[in-house]
Structures are given as C-alpha cells and as structure tokens.
Amino acid sequence: RGLGDVYKRQELIDYYFAQAPSRSCERTFANVYLWSRQYKVKYAILHNALVFRDEGDGHTYAYPVGKPEAVKAALEELMKICEEEGCEFGLYCVTPENFSQMEEWYPGQFQIEYDRDQADYIYETEKLATLAGKKLHGKRNHINKFKQLYPEWSYESLSDENVEACFQMALKWRNSNGCNDDPETVSYTHLTLP
C-alpha cells in the first residue's frame, strides 16, 4: 500500500499509460507530474494496475490503469482500503467505457457524475499544429503575442536540472490566474456509491 512520488518514475508510469491509451490529460505524465504537488498526487501499483491517489482530497483515486483483470483487482483493493479506513470510495477520470466495465463487474452499485468544469479540451493534431481557420484565430493571436513578448522562448525536455523551475512556473501561473482562490479546483468527475 506504499504510495510513491510521481517524479523519477516516468518510465514506469508511461508503461502503464501505454497499456490503456486515453485522450484524457489525466493520462499524460507531464500533466500528472505538473499537478502532483497541488493535488498531492501519489501513485501505487496494485495487482499490476497503476493507481493515483489525490491525498489532498481524502481517498479519491484515479480510475486504475492496466489490463481489465488487474483493474478489477485494484478496484476491489481500493474499496477494501476505503472500507477499512471508514471513508467514501470515489474515483475520478472515469470514462464512459470505464463505467460500462464497472457496471459489468458491479451492476447498479455505482453512479457517475459529470463535472463539465473538469472536462478536457481536445483538438485534432493537424488543426492545433496549423491553427488554421476562424475558430482558432484567438489562439493564433495569443501565440503571436507570446512570441513578441518572449522572443527568447524555447522548448526543453524535463530533467533534474529544470524540474523545480517547471514547478515554480506552474505555481506562478496558478497564482496569477486566481486558481488558488477557487474552491472548485480540486473537483473531479467522481464515481461514488449511491
């Protein structure tokens, strides 16, 4: 039941993400890593399934990642942990496919709630790469303004040397955009017992 810190385990986490491809930002190492301090995210491997726990919000877990039999075993372990510790069992990052699978395993036992505020924006690669068309005009303007304001910008791979700077940049962005004042920032799509 030991929970590990996310950083330094990218290879392991990416291995599990590759087993269950998803378009969710919650299923990318960069996103999990950058938000791991804010939400106190820890991970564990339970029954050969990857599980994330948001320690800042009680016992809330991301839907496990792995092969179906491993996911079911991990879910049962998580439910047991919550029962032993006397807390409500809740999941986030539950896709319609995940919920269908749970309905198969546990008919009528769970309900799902959609939280629009936590939905991902999904763009087609080509449209985002070219930013062509009227719909993406605003994004083109933002990028052009950024390039004017920061002519020395560059891309960098995440490394030991720049990891703290990345966290500080993300925290600075959150502070300047009022995210710390928003009580809803820890809200997710939850799956709970009815």
Predicted features, each with a name:
Residues F17-A20, L78-G86, Y150, A170-R174:
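Hydrophobic, Leu/Ile/Phe/Ala-enriched alpha-helical segments that form helix-helix packing faces
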Residues E88-W105, R116-D120:
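Short, glycine/charge-rich beta-strand/loop segments that flank catalytic centers
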Residues A20-Y39, W153-L191:
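A conserved beta-strand-loop-helix scaffold within acyl/acetyltransferase catalytic domains
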Residues A74-E76, E104-Q109:
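Short acidic (Asp/Glu) patches
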Residues E26-E97:
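Conserved donor-binding loop and adjoining core beta-sheet/short helix segment
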Residues G2-Q10, T189-P194:
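Conserved small/polar residues in nucleotide/adenosyl-binding loops
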Residues I13:
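Ligand/cofactor-recognition surfaces for anionic moieties
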Residues P107-N180:
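Acyltransferase donor/substrate-recognition loop-hinge adjacent to the catalytic core
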